[in-house]
Amino acid sequence: MQSYVLEMKGITKEFPGVRALDNVTFSVRKGEIHALCGENGAGKSTLMKVLSGVYPYGSYDGKIYIEGKEVRFRNIKESQEAGIAIIYQELAVVEEMTVAENLFLGHELMRGKYIDWNRLYSEAQKWLQKIGLDIDPETKVRNLTVGKQQLIEIAKALSKNAKIIILDEPTAALTDSDVATLKNILCDLRSQGVTCIYISHRLNEVMELADTVTVLRDGQTISTDRIELLTEEQIIAKMVGRELNELYPYEPRNVGKEILKVDHYSVIDEQTGREVIHDVSFSLKAGEILGISGLMGSGRTELFTSLFGAYHGKKKGTVWIDGKQVDIRRPAEAIQYGMAYVSEDRKKYGLVLEMDIIKNSTLVALKKVTKWNVIDHALEVKQAEEITKRMKLKAPTLEAKVSQLSGGNQQKVVLSKWLLNSPKILILDEPTRGIDVGAKYEIYKIINELASQGVGIVLISSELPEVMGMSDRILVMSEGRITGEFQRHEATQEKIMTCATGGK
């Protein structure tokens, strides 16, 4: 039996009014990939911040042991010196610097008072080769994909002689190719005796990669098990504290009249002159959930941002809303016609991160909270309270900045913003991306509730089980065209993928 490289015992961490960690025990063996799972708010990030010295010794109760020796980190530097490296979802690379400069940032290779550039580049090449990355160390990081930037972070950790590498949602922004590369590297590191703590909501990756899984819930350790003793459903049940008999709580309903009709619709990109949407026709009914599936680059987002007036391109074709022909050129016009659009990138397009929940949730419906063209703060608070309560938002206060919320709660704020405007047509682009299974379930219930109230919903998703589990009808796109249409009972993953790859 391999010895423990890390033991955290009785870790308790409190913030004003909140016990984030409650007597947590977490032990990791040398040379294993150890998954740390839990819903947003379960305590995963807090525990890792305790381990990495972000929360210094004295700010928490409990003890930490590295290779059997108690450690008391007062800052991040001390944890790094002990062999701990943490790679966050938001990468800490400097894009204007070269790969080599990033690798040795903070521990530069010196010759006297000056950087030894020849040695720096040759050492960088060595570490890049160690993780199988064939790139010039003099390349500017800005020219690399997000996946390769993440691998640079791993190489940087290894260059500091890291014994334990913590990866926080490492595949959230990666392409399938980059994910495959990362998986291979993690397996290689495991064979070299490097320990990886793997935090991810993607349980299929956990099942594939991890040796051991620890589940946290509400700041407590629920279980630690070998992966071969668990199923994905059992992990979910431990995370949420209940059995999820159906991951996708579909509710049959009667759909109403046609509220959106698109006929022979094409879009030409203004910059490239390329036709990104080709002769598309479809309809949406009140109370219907219309799933949109397709591979990356299939044109799903371009189609619906164009219909919403948010895509810069020349349009051909006809659009009707409630039987009336419309020509929407700006999002403001789409909103007037009762449309709402939840973007796939909530942080960039859906929220003002440094503003509070109240202001974010009323952004689209300012007319509802103004008197004589002046915002009535009391009315704004009242409206925000009502809509966020309906969304079951979890936050310490509505005056908290949305940047401080979990991914699931941020998405609820985005939904609140649009629902305050009472839309007839709600377009959801990757609505559950980057949120945990418990929060996903809550989002699905909200979607069902809205559909039962007669809202027509477009559900764009890269997750086939999500599209199949939630939709009444599914359209498949490939290269800007609709290549397949299925009723709920007809759809299979094989049929959808055949259409998504251009087959029939």
From Swiss-Prot:
ATP binds at G38, E39, N40, G41, A42, G43, K44, S45. PROSITE patterns: ABC_TRANSPORTER_1 (PS00211), ABC_TRANSPORTER_2 (PS50893), XYLG (PS51280). It comes from the Bacteria. Keywords: ATP-binding, Cell membrane, Membrane, Nucleotide-binding, Repeat, Sugar transport, Translocase, Transport. It is a peripheral membrane protein. Its main location: membrane. PANTHER family: CARBOHYDRATE TRANSPORT ATP-BINDING PROTEIN MG119-RELATED, XYLOSE IMPORT ATP-BINDING PROTEIN XYLG. The complex is composed of two ATP-binding proteins (XylG), two transmembrane proteins (XylH) and a solute-binding protein (XylF). This is Xylose import ATP-binding protein XylG. It comes from Geobacillus kaustophilus (strain HTA426).
